[in-house]
């Protein structure tokens, strides 16, 4: 904050020259407020926004993303906001900061706490509202990612791994309550098959799966 002013490029000065100018500012914590003069990078926003707190194993440390995720998100927010401002035809200042950009990624977690007092815990690669949802190792040492966000898909996956007749896993709440048991069964099922076999069986069952690729793939 204040860099434009120190350079003599205060938005008020610029707007006197060009009233239609859109000035976009991106900082760690915004132009005002108690944190405005603090140094801030992606790491700080990932920590303060609550993002790191939900990443990692339940009994492990909070994990930071291995890329500058916040920088990418804030850049998209700034680009979108700038386009909207330009389209409006009104000169203005677009004030984007890293932490607010990351808070947008937190989605329902903010009102979940505000309305119900619930704080999402770390679940490794899992998420609270989908079971199973994880990465699993196949017999040939490859990895696949599974998600069952739709009830019909979850039912097909339960049938596929031999748990379809167990009433404990017949609905969402039952699967969530037995997350660890289902994960163990899924891991066993995957470990008995190659990645090619896993992909073929999931495709035949119309269930969602994808190989875990790196850049070389």
Set out the residue ranges of the language-model regions.
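Short acidic, glycine-rich surface-loop motifs adjacent to enzyme active sites
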Residues: 1-3
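Aromatic-enriched alpha-helical interface/lid elements that frame and gate functional surfaces
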Residues: 132-209
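Active-site-adjacent "lid/gating" segments in soluble enzymes
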Residues: 5-143, 147-148
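Conserved PLP-binding catalytic core of the aspartate aminotransferase-like
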Residues: 210-217
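Structural signal for conserved beta-strand scaffold positions within catalytic alpha/beta enzyme cores
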Residues: 25, 98, 168-171, 211
């Amino acid at each position: 904050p204040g860099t434009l002013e120190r350079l003599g490029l205060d938005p008020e000065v610029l707007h006197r020259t060009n009233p239609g100018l859109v000035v976009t500012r991106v900082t760690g914590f915004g132009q005002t407020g108690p944190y405005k003069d603090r140094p801030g990078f992606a790491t700080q926003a990932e920590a303060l926004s609550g993002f790191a707190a939900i990443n990692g194993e339940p009994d492990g440390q909070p994990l930071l993303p291995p890329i500058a995720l916040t920088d990418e998100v804030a850049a998209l927010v700034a680009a979108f906001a700038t386009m909207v401002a330009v389209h409006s035809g009104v000169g203005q200042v677009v004030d984007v900061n890293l932490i607010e950009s990351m808070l947008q990624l937190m989605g329902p977690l903010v009102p979940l706490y505000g309305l119900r007092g619930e704080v999402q815990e770390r679940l490794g690669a899992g998420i609270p509202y989908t079971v199973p949802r994880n990465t699993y190792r196949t017999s040939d040492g490859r990895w696949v990612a599974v998600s069952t966000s739709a009830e019909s898909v979850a039912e097909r996956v339960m049938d596929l791994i031999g748990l379809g007749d167990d009433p404990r896993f017949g609905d969402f709440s039952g699967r969530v309550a037995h997350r660890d048991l289902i994960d163990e069964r899924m891991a066993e099922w995957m470990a008995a098959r190659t990645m090619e076999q896993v992909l073929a069986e999931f495709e035949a069952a119309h269930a969602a799966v994808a190989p875990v690729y790196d850049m070389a793939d």
